[in-house]
């Protein structure tokens, strides 16, 4: 179980978001390797601790992580590691604002 705090909970889109669920997929994968456990015997869940909800302040939902999802997740992780090692960084141009965004805005390190 991975415990998360939130205000009202997550909508179905957030619960199904691959980048959110890949976190638990990786936990399961590496836990299974470390402890020599068959991944089929491990079940993963998110537990949402809702700060402002009046009722049902804790919501627990299962995150599925079969072989194909694990393969896709590891492929994405390996691509990210490769690009980081090759110094291929993606520029977030939406963060190029003075004051609230990139700390390198209009400095010698800015390639905007």
Regions found by a protein language model. Give the residues of each.
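Non-catalytic protein-protein interaction segments used by genome-maintenance enzymes to assemble
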Residues: 1-24
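Metal-dependent nuclease catalytic regions and adjoining charged, substrate-binding loops involved
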Residues: 29-112
